[in-house]
Curated annotation (Swiss-Prot):
Residues 178-237 bind DNA. It is found in: Nucleus. It comes from Rattus norvegicus (Rat). This is BarH-like 1 homeobox protein. Residues 33-54 have a biased composition (Low complexity). Residues 308-318 have a biased composition (Pro residues). One of its GO terms (biological process) is positive regulation of transcription by RNA polymerase II. Keywords: DNA-binding, Homeobox, Nucleus, Transcription, Transcription regulation. PROSITE patterns: HOMEOBOX_1 (PS00027), HOMEOBOX_2 (PS50071).
Length: 327
């Protein structure tokens, strides 16, 4: 019933897979062949007693793809520039298996144009092409790096030469503020300044202007000299006080520094603290009388003369006084 109506599986496959490459006088050829065996690559096996499996056909398709275009059944239909062998095999077999689709894909190196004789040109191996392209890119990169390095070296050298030339032409930049030149005083000017400083440690504005005019100096020069001289005087005074205090020689200290350190205590205590500052401005007063002489009395007696008897010494503790014997 299936054979009479023409709806059998074999009849449908035979009508759908019909190809002009198949011989017309063999109607049973499509009944005993699978769709994969109808491709031009498998026409050499015309025996229908042992049909090949689809896996074997796919393996043969992947291995025998380069020479598939030279089949005997397709010589009259294909021209040298029309269709490739895998595309024609896809059209004939109408197989949509993943293995057939992957087998039909050519590598990139195999897609070279055909020669004039109709035979495909021998493709160059992909590894050699990749190596050649890598070598070309490496050469270009080396050239660009070398040119860039040479340019940078030239620029650095040029900048260094420019800096050297500019440093030779221009004076070096000083970070610190340049110091002013010191005033060279003459011996006469120094003597007058020292004499004025002995009289007055601090000058008023009018006195300073008069002294500057008399010595042919500026007011700033006199003011600076007085400031430096007061600093030196205070430092010497502090050092002298320490040394003399350690030695205990207060009389020498009073003779050296009569004012303002050794005013009588009663006078200094009665003055206002603000008014006590004016003691520096006035002339130095004569040294006051010694309140407690530190020199031994026997030396004072020797200086006064031998006519007067020496005053009696105070008795020492723990020693009995002896009576004076007549001479």
């Amino acid at each position: 019933m299936e054979g009479s109506n023409g709806f059998g599986i074999d009849s449908i496959l035979s009508h759908r897979a019909g190809s002009p490459a198949l011989p017309k006088g063999d109607p049973l050829l499509g009944d005993c062949r699978s769709p994969l065996e109808l491709s031009p690559r498998s026409e050499s096996s015309s025996d229908c007693s042992s049909p090949a499996s689809p896996g074997r056909d796919c393996l043969e398709t992947s291995t025998s793809r380069p020479g598939a275009a030279s089949g005997p059944g397709l010589d009259s239909h294909l021209q040298p520039g029309q269709l490739s062998a895998p595309a024609q095999s896809r059209t004939v077999t109408s197989s949509f298996l993943i293995r057939d689709i992957l087998a039909d894909c050519k590598p990139l190196a195999a897609c070279a144009p055909y020669s004039s004789s109709g035979q495909p040109a021998a493709p160059e191996p992909g590894g050699r092409l990749a190596a050649k392209a890598g070598e070309d890119f490496r050469d270009k990169l080396d050239k660009s790096v070398s040119s860039a390095s040479s340019d940078s070296e030239y620029k650095v050298k040029e900048e260094g030469d420019r800096e050297i030339s500019s440093s030779r032409d221009s004076p070096p930049v000083r970070l610190k503020k340049p110091r002013k030149a010191r005033t060279a005083f003459t011996d006469h000017q120094l003597a007058q300044l020292e004499r004025s400083f002995e009289r007055q440690k601090y000058l008023s504005v009018q006195d300073r202007m008069e002294l500057a005019a008399s010595l042919n100096l500026t007011d700033t020069q006199v003011k600076t000299w007085y400031q430096n001289r007061r600093t030196k005087w205070k430092r010497q005074t502090a050092v002298g006080l320490e040394l003399l205090a350690e030695a205990g020689n207060y009389s020498a200290l009073q003779r050296m520094f009569p004012s303002p350190y050794f005013y009588p205590q009663s006078l200094v205590s009665n003055l206002d603290p603000g008014a006590a500052l004016y003691l520096y401005r006035g002339p130095s007063a004569p040294p006051p009388a010694l309140q407690r002489p530190l020199v031994p009395r026997i030396l004072i007696h020797g200086l006064q003369g031998a006519s007067e008897p020496p005053p009696p010494l105070p008795p020492l503790p723990g020693v009995l006084p002896r009576a004076a014997q007549p001479r």
